[in-house]
Amino acid sequence: MKHILLSCVESRIEHNRSFYSRFQLGPFDLGQGLTVGNAFRRTLLSELSGVGITLIEIDGVCHEYSTLPGVRESVLDILLNLKQLVLTSDTTFTVPQVGYLNFTGPGVVTAKDLKLPVSVYCVDPDQPIATLSADATLNFKFLVCQGKNYIIQTPVDKFHEYQKKILNSKLNLPLSSRTTLNSTFERPNQDSLVGTPLQEGVGKTKQNKRLNAHFQRQLKQLNRLKETSFKAYKTKVGEKTISDEFQTNSVNHQNLTTFDLREKKLTDVTTSLQHGEEATLLKEEGLNKLDNSSPQLENKLKGGRDFSGGSQLASQALPVDTLFMPIKKVNYMIDIDPAEPDRESVVLEIWTNGSIHPRQAVHEAAKQLIHLFSPFLQTHLVPTTLQSTPYSKAASKTQEFSLNETSTEKVKDELGKVAFGSENNTAALNQQKNLVTAIQTLDIANLNFSLRTFTFLKKENINTVSELVEFWTRQKTEAKDSIQSNVQSSVLLEISNNLKNFGVLPTS
């Protein structure tokens, strides 16, 4: 049989966060390639560990839907950029590590500006995080953890506390598009012209849209008032007066219709002119209010304070759904060499995120598979050390317990004959009683019997260790009484050796 080899056929670096390699594994017997390829693929995608950011606390940010003054990206975009960072570590750590960032604009914040923990570094230092304008600052700290697969965090308690705080504070919207929740303010007995509470990030375009919508609502209200007053006037004067006047002047129906149409057109023109003048006045009044409040608002926004009390809201830790998997994609294909039709090989394609080399990923996957299947390997029972008990050495050699005596009283009688060298006799008694009970119900498949002996015992309907001890005792009694038995001496010897190694029978 040829040696099974792992050879790299092709490898390339597509970019800093994408490594590709194609390996050939084999040769294998027909049918083994599918088992190996599928096992490697599933292990590579699920069992390899990685490093990622799991928790972020940004200075002055209470939730991920807010914005920061002087920062182009919203907090949600910053969280997504940090989630996409590819981190790696030379060592394995179980305790979360702390990193931080202190950056003052103008400039673009990249991964190389992060102050990462020891032995943790970023694969792509030029990966962007945020863009800051002049006099803008971005300060935050984060946790770096190591894990497998991915985690989805649902901090229900934190969000519930945040919502209660918002409802109790009754905060309105800021007017600037570059503010955080710290710059929100109260406007008592006034309606906000920009937005509704719990909204942020309203830009200049949205401000204009909101103002236009507000003016349209005001115009609709004026239209309703004019229509109501006009109907009341017609009701008070009466329509019969107009019709009688036309009838007395001998005006026909066609002239009356023409007069109504002209009157309607004249009314529409007059109303539109009035509405236009009122809309212009309202718009100028609103813009004057915005211009007058701009300096005061700008000072408040720069200071990061609210108008209600001047106190800054506390920052909240924002969880991140982290993806720890260093493997992006795995494909495998079974290849049969025409020169050797009875042999096959596996072609394995691996794409990584740059935090691990594809060849190292194959080695780690093989280790994980070995670790996964190692508990199912054949185990060899080590001779027990039941003689090293708190009892005296002389008594422990001569003492033998009968496993088919299951009553507690008999176990106490047997143990009472032993000279204890320990003061805690009750604990030793309970431990020995539990051990005897566990051994009694143990299946004989846990003993190292040969296939022939195991088959013989099963045919004799011997399934547990207690039944095996009873069978061995009966065979020993028959041998003393010179009764011929159909059990071979080799089988009895194997049973005796296994029971001695298991600690059920004395070794001498």
UniProtKB/Swiss-Prot annotation:
Residues 1-380 are annotated as: Alpha N-terminal domain (alpha-NTD). It comes from the Eukaryota. One of its GO terms (cellular component) is DNA-directed RNA polymerase complex. The keyword Cell inner membrane does not apply. The keyword Nucleus does not apply. It catalyses: RNA(n) + a ribonucleoside 5'-triphosphate = RNA(n+1) + diphosphate. GO terms for molecular function: DNA binding; DNA-directed RNA polymerase activity; protein dimerization activity. Keywords: Chloroplast, DNA-directed RNA polymerase, Nucleotidyltransferase, Plastid, Transcription, Transferase. Pfam families: RNA_pol_A_bac, RNA_pol_A_CTD, RNA_pol_L. Transmembrane segments: none annotated. Its EC number is 2.7.7.6. The N-terminal domain is essential for RNAP assembly and basal transcription, whereas the C-terminal domain is involved in interaction with transcriptional regulators and with upstream promoter elements. DNA-dependent RNA polymerase catalyzes the transcription of DNA into RNA using the four ribonucleoside triphosphates as substrates. This is DNA-directed RNA polymerase subunit alpha. It comes from Oltmannsiellopsis viridis. The gene is rpoA.
